[in-house]
């Protein structure tokens, strides 16, 4: 029958298209150097988020940052707006503390509550389009955001007051202007890469001869620290920010050794805790603080992690660390040594350089990653553009190895030097 249709001119072209579709096999070549130079130039100006997108899927990166395709903007209060409001409000609050006569250890509770409200108003005004908040649904969401911000400020202050680390910098912007080795990379004789970004918070603790640095990144989503994701290039931000903060701190404290203390995500939330109604207010507060514990990895030196939570017994409610009765670390503690921090740092730097070179070499493969039940397609808005379908020949996921043992991951990082 196909031969009959092909032999008739009025049907031949349609049949040809049908046969092409039926036996389609996806193939793809990298884009040429002339194209990459036109898109990116010889100096890549990158955010870390952009490189994480490249690690998830090179084609998605190409569409977003090369061709600069954008989703249609709608006049609505979206999750990204909530995240921006949280960040801006926390920045305004921190500036008020820094410019006042108080510290994070002495700020009165009534003033704390007042400044939260004012900082929230400042953040909303900074959004520009305040009309969107007049809608009933958005007014309700805004009240929830305010309640969450109040809980967040309470928790952040409680965490600070449990230790010796002091918030020293907020919304630290770094770029090529800072001439930091941590964010400037040579890809070839003619090509360079410069990273830009903003560190939400840098805390420091100063001993007699050392300064310890802790990074905190505020997240309104459910982002969890993963050493494996660092290994696969999917979660580079905290390590890059730590490298930049260590270099900036070293320039500030020229006579002291600067060491990494920890890298953390703080999940902005307003959790509910289980109980039977007999708990005291203090027990409830401790349970909430436990829910809002920093998520990340801590330096295993006792002097360092104890400076983040001075007098905890058993498990800390501030950091992911617990001690046995003899004072040794529990197996569940999320810790690494100073040397292992350097291992992560060196590995991430090599990964960044390799990614930059791949981008300039024209890598645009439609090969999203897959690891367990997660893929590079999960939150990608470009599926209708790439038409990725693993059932079609030539389309396939890039399978990433699942490694559970931290020591194995760190050994791999050392070996791939």
Residue ranges, per PLM feature:
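Structural signature of nuclease core domains in nucleic-acid processing machines
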Residues: 1-417
